[in-house]
Each structure stands twice: as structure tokens, then as C-alpha cells.
Amino acid sequence: MTQRFKVTLAYDGTNFAGFQAQPNQRTVQFVLEKAINKMSKKDEYITVYGSGRTDSGVHALGQVVHFDFPHPISAKGMLRGLNSMLPLDCEVVDCKIVPNDFHSRYTTHGKRYLYRVSRGEFVNPFKRLYTGHYKYPLDIEKIKEAMPDVEGTHDYSSFVASGSQAKSHVRTIYEAKVYEDKVNDEIVFEFYGNGFLYNQVRIMVATLLEIGNGKRPVHDFLRLYEVKDRSQARQTAPASGLYLKEVYYDEEDEKL
């Protein structure tokens, strides 16, 4: 009897070439499928389907995948089995048996990303893989003033990297906020939206940092929506500071 599993993953993206499987590359999908197929011991290969891709160096606190497993096993048994086989930079943090029409990508209602920025003149060696570093002066009040402009439904063409396969660049951001983590001397950005374009969060963060540094006017996002020109927002924040925090679904879609 085949069972469909919804699995939530946390991973350190430093040594992964992104989420999606690629030839001769160590990816999150590769190590997860390796563990699942080892547990299955069947000739038919089991494929994992993710809620979306993360790039090389990008981390996840709550990436979601689904797959169909050919043997009866409890959710707890699956969680323990996978974690006994996965490398130390990838962990299953939650596991559920879900209906066969649940799809990790196509039934999602939104995603939440974090971006952490470390401060200081020099790069902290213990943060270099887990934050983006910004050494220049910042007025966080200017950034806070700009954050409402990030929210809403807009054409984010100025904030998408080349290589995007999206047919439309219109997205809705329900919530955008920034706050200081004074204990770690970091600035944290948080974005919750119905979906995000290729490198969108990293480009938006780089643009907001330029606003905080006085290189751009506070409400420059409004102009960038109008011009729809990536060359007007050239900078991209490093992958190391980006975290996929959570993927949202309707609880009804997960009920058996």
C-alpha cells in the first residue's frame, strides 16, 4: 500500500549545490532521495517533490517535500529512519502521512523567508556562512519606513534575476518587516508572500540596504515597480543570509 508523506526539512545550505537534483552535484534532493530509496529497497525509484528550489548556499528551517512510499510505515518511523541516514547538515523536523492529492508545490498558500545581515567593519568568521555582511553605515529607521512599500501586489520585474522561467512577475507580499537582533548585532528581514521570483528576496534586501545607507530615496521601491528594469536594482545580497523559514498549506489539504 503506497503512502504519501509530507516531510519538513531543515538544512545548512553551505555544502549543497541547491535543493534540486543536478548531475554530479550534492543537492538536498539527492541526499534525501538516496536515504528514501535505501529505506524502500525497491527497484522502482522514489522521487521527491519540493515546495520550491533553494540556491546553493541558501538555508532552510522549514522546506517541505512530498513523496510516495511503497511500504506501510508510521510517520514517526519514517522520521527516525530518514534522520538515521541523512547527513548531519540535513534533518527531518516533521513528518506526516497526507492524502494522495496533496502536493508540496501546487497546494502551497505561501512562503516565509528570513534574511540575516551581520554588522561591523569586518566579517565575523563564525557568521560568514550564515549571514550576509554589510559594513557600511545604516539608518534602520529609513529601512522601516520603506518596508510598507514592499508589501502588496506588484510587478517585481526589477527584482528578478536573469534565468527566471516565471511567466508573470506579479506577486503578492502579505507581510514585510525588519528588526534588530541586538544580541548578535544583526538586522533581520522577514518576508511572507504567495510566492517569490528567482533571487527576489536577495535583490530586495540589497535594495533596502542601499536605502538604509542613503544611496536610494526611502520610497524608491515605488519607482522600481514602475520601471520594471533589473538594471535599476543591480545588487544581490549573498545567498548565505537567506533562510526558507516556513511553507504554508491549508490544514484541510493534509487531512486523511
Curated annotation (Swiss-Prot):
It catalyses: uridine(38/39/40) in tRNA = pseudouridine(38/39/40) in tRNA. GO terms for biological process: tRNA pseudouridine synthesis. It holds the Pfam family PseudoU_synth_1. It is an enzyme of class 5 (isomerase). InterPro entries: PsdUridine_synth_cat_dom_sf, PsdUridine_synth_TruA, PsdUridine_synth_TruA_a/b_dom, PsdUridine_synth_TruA_C, TruA/RsuA/RluB/E/F_N. CDD domains: PseudoU_synth_EcTruA. GO terms for molecular function: RNA binding; tRNA pseudouridine(38-40) synthase activity. Substrate binds at Y113. Disulfide bonds: none annotated. Its EC number is 5.4.99.12. Keywords: Isomerase, tRNA processing. It comes from the Bacteria. The active site is at D55. HAMAP family: TruA. NCBIfam families: hisT_truA. Belongs to the tRNA pseudouridine synthase TruA family. Homodimer. Formation of pseudouridine at positions 38, 39 and 40 in the anticodon stem and loop of transfer RNAs. This is tRNA pseudouridine synthase A. The gene is truA.
